UniProtKB/Swiss-Prot annotation:
Protein name: ATP-dependent target DNA activator B
Function according to Swiss-Prot or TrEMBL: Selects the target DNA sites for transposition. Recruits DDE-recombinase A to the target sites and catalytically activates it. Displays non-specific DNA-binding properties. Polymerizes as helical filaments around the DNA. Coating of the DNA by the target DNA activator B might play a role in favoring target-primed replication over integration. Prevents self-integration into an integrated copy of the viral genome.
A Pfam match: AAA_22
InterPro entries assigned: AAA_22, B_transposit_C_sf, B_transpositn_C, ExeA_AAA_ATPase_DNA-bind, Lambda_DNA-bd_dom_sf, P-loop_NTPase
Domain comment, as recorded: The N-terminus region contains a putative DNA-binding region that allows filament-filament interactions and probably favors MuB polymerization and filament clustering. The central region contains the ATPase module. The C-terminus comprises four helices arranged in a loosely packed bundle which can bind to dsDNA.
Site note Sensor-1, residues: 202
Biological process annotations from GO: DNA integration; DNA replication; DNA transposition; viral DNA genome replication
Cell location: Host cytoplasm
Gene of this entry: B
Length: 312
């Protein structure tokens, strides 16, 4: 691909509103000014270097465009179950806990709920932001408070002022990383602002507060949990809904998908298998079938050059 072809390819994408200079800059590592000047043949710098970077961007763009489009979001039975808890917490201004094994769809359900509802804010806790200050800072950024205070006391007060009267919902994903001090801070924030709060994570997020593991530290929080939703495994109805979204309805294929969904990682592994199977089938001009699904599930554990699948 010569420089003229690269310029023409980029110009076509921008003129057809398939992308923007800003998006190309973000994904290529170049500035918007450099890209604009290069496309218009007015760049005075190293055109060879820029053309190589933009050629790599173009190749990746077209490779992604060739991939079969997966369903954007599938509203499964488990999703509805999670949404019910979120609505309850929001409407009753209370605390709900959603816990379950990895890969059952908790995070995607929460993201979609945030996307389709007003005043819903979601943060994901990592070990590096599990302290009171870091957790509250993460929440402040999610709320658009980019100039928020950097000390716990002032930050907590600023968050209370921001959340009061919003009738909103705060979702804390991976809340099992949080200790008693942070959870108590979130409880007080929820109580004072009368917003809903959903703590979401693995079963430890709930077991810390119950049974033999419950301590005095967690007692006040536990007594204020209004609703608990535990998702132990993938439901058959979830797998059927996902298969329908992918237009897969063969009996053998459905049975295999049910088996895959029972593996560790559940729906996450299922969706990876479906995407890889769809890529392989698409590259051969065929529909996804049992053989492609089995091959995809095996290859997820192997060293496979994915880029070759579309060329076969």
């Amino acid at each position: 691909m010569n420089i003229s072809d690269i310029r023409a390819g980029l110009r076509t994408l921008v003129e057809n509103e398939e992308t923007t200079f800003k998006q190309i800059a973000l994904e290529s590592g170049l500035s918007t000014g450099t890209i604009s000047s290069f496309i218009n043949d007015k760049y005075n710098g190293d055109n060879e270097r820029v053309s190589q970077m933009l050629q790599r961007w173009l190749e990746k763009y077209h490779a992604v465009a060739e991939l079969p489009e997966p369903p954007r979001f599938v509203e499964t039975q488990t999703v509805k179950q999670i949404w019910t808890s979120m609505r309850f917490a929001s409407l009753t201004e209370s605390i709900a806990v959603v816990c379950g094994n990895p890969g059952v769809g908790k995070t995607e359900a929460a993201r979609e709920y945030r996307r389709t509802n007003n005043n819903v804010w979601m943060i994901t806790i990592t070990p590096s932001c599990a302290s009171v200050l870091e957790c509250l800072t993460e929440l402040a950024f999610e709320l658009g408070m980019n100039d928020a205070p950097r000390r716990k006391g002032p930050l907590s007060r600023a968050l209370r002022r921001r959340l009061e009267g919003t009738q909103g919902l705060v979702i804390i994903d991976e809340a099992d990383h949080l200790g008693a001090e942070v959870l108590e801070e979130l409880r007080l924030l929820q109580e004072s602002t009368r917003t809903g709060l959903v703590l979401m994570g693995n079963h430890r997020v709930y077991s810390n507060m119950t049974g033999g593991n419950r301590t005095v530290e967690f007692a006040r929080l536990f007594s204020r949990i209004a609703k608990r939703t535990a998702i132990n495994k993938t439901k058959k109805a979830d797998v059927k809904a996902i298969a329908d979204a992918w237009q897969i309805n063969g009996e053998n294929e459905l049975e295999l998908l049910q088996q895959i969904a029972q593996k560790p990682g559940a729906l996450r592994i299922l969706n990876h298998s479906l995407r890889l199977a769809a890529m392989t089938a698409h590259g051969k001009g065929e529909r996804v079938n049992e053989d492609y699904l089995r091959q995809a599930f095996r290859e997820l554990d192997l060293d496979v050059d994915i880029s070759t699948l579309l060329r076969n």
